[in-house]
């Protein structure tokens, strides 16, 4: 009987719990749900196992407060950290979450050095950088969940604008996972037709698309403002699952993620949201898009924002 992949989730809050539920429903692998809060991962694991029986899933879910239980994990998704609250930017979280991430990284290195690691904790581009440097894992094994989520928001808003199914929309969002992200209308399509061409057909306007781009940049903040006590979790979890599945099933899928750049896009030693191909080797390739002067200026501005944050923790 083939052994299930072992998937460890570091952090058992809203995103961690949602991740576990989605992994179980898709039967992607057995789950270890870790948290420092005693009883929380154990209780959620019991609840999730009982929910899984209704769906007919035989996936095993274990709750724990001991990092040793992540030993030998095939994949790890990290959500541990303080969530955003109203009035906070992703960047306000940097000091507290850097300390948390360093501790997580040390334990990942100790117990699961061969795992493929997906970081969700904000501020994303900094946290995934901390994970890489503190763990010493190869950069192709460590990525951040950013562009898949940002693109999903862009997809939704474009589908609403053009009154089509979201399945017809394919969009691209580059840069840091923050207010300076760069949604690219030129590289976004409806059934293969680029947005600029649809504008020329009179189906939308540059003004409307710019409003959608702004709404995409503020997508996470809008949810924080409405929830008041936390941040988005369903969409971030669903986004990470798409990345996880691409790795576990060797799908060689092109997704926009926070990837470690070594000269691509003119960026060195930073994590920034760009299209990559994910398969069983982790990050197989970084895809370099040809940007216009205006797009490159916006991208560079976003990169500078990430650099500035990195400098605050060094």
From Swiss-Prot:
<dbReference type="InterPro" id="IPR022383">
    <property type="entry name" value="Lactate/malate_DH_C"/>
</dbReference>
<feature type="active site" description="Proton acceptor">
    <location>
        <position position="177"/>
    </location>
</feature>
<dbReference type="InterPro" id="IPR036291">
    <property type="entry name" value="NAD(P)-bd_dom_sf"/>
</dbReference>
<comment type="similarity">
    <text>Belongs to the LDH/MDH superfamily. MDH type 3 family.</text>
</comment>
<dbReference type="InterPro" id="IPR001557">
    <property type="entry name" value="L-lactate/malate_DH"/>
</dbReference>
<dbReference type="Pfam" id="PF00056">
    <property type="entry name" value="Ldh_1_N"/>
</dbReference>
<keyword id="KW-0560">Oxidoreductase</keyword>
<feature type="binding site">
    <location>
        <position position="122"/>
    </location>
    <ligand>
        <name>substrate</name>
    </ligand>
</feature>
<protein>
    <recommendedName>
        <fullName>Malate dehydrogenase</fullName>
        <ecNumber>1.1.1.37</ecNumber>
    </recommendedName>
</protein>
<dbReference type="GO" id="GO:0030060">
    <property type="term" value="F:L-malate dehydrogenase (NAD+) activity"/>
</dbReference>
<dbReference type="GO" id="GO:0004459">
    <property type="term" value="F:L-lactate dehydrogenase activity"/>
</dbReference>
<keyword id="KW-0816">Tricarboxylic acid cycle</keyword>
<feature type="binding site">
    <location>
        <begin position="11"/>
        <end position="16"/>
    </location>
    <ligand>
        <name>NAD(+)</name>
    </ligand>
</feature>
<dbReference type="Pfam" id="PF02866">
    <property type="entry name" value="Ldh_1_C"/>
</dbReference>
<keyword id="KW-0520">NAD</keyword>
<feature type="binding site">
    <location>
        <begin position="120"/>
        <end position="122"/>
    </location>
    <ligand>
        <name>NAD(+)</name>
    </ligand>
</feature>
<feature type="binding site">
    <location>
        <position position="153"/>
    </location>
    <ligand>
        <name>substrate</name>
    </ligand>
</feature>
<dbReference type="GO" id="GO:0006089">
    <property type="term" value="P:lactate metabolic process"/>
</dbReference>
<dbReference type="InterPro" id="IPR015955">
    <property type="entry name" value="Lactate_DH/Glyco_Ohase_4_C"/>
</dbReference>
<feature type="binding site">
    <location>
        <position position="84"/>
    </location>
    <ligand>
        <name>substrate</name>
    </ligand>
</feature>
<comment type="function">
    <text>Catalyzes the reversible oxidation of malate to oxaloacetate.</text>
</comment>
<dbReference type="GO" id="GO:0006099">
    <property type="term" value="P:tricarboxylic acid cycle"/>
</dbReference>
<feature type="binding site">
    <location>
        <position position="90"/>
    </location>
    <ligand>
        <name>substrate</name>
    </ligand>
</feature>
<dbReference type="InterPro" id="IPR011275">
    <property type="entry name" value="Malate_DH_type3"/>
</dbReference>
<feature type="binding site">
    <location>
        <position position="97"/>
    </location>
    <ligand>
        <name>NAD(+)</name>
    </ligand>
</feature>
<feature type="binding site">
    <location>
        <position position="35"/>
    </location>
    <ligand>
        <name>NAD(+)</name>
    </ligand>
</feature>
<dbReference type="InterPro" id="IPR001236">
    <property type="entry name" value="Lactate/malate_DH_N"/>
</dbReference>
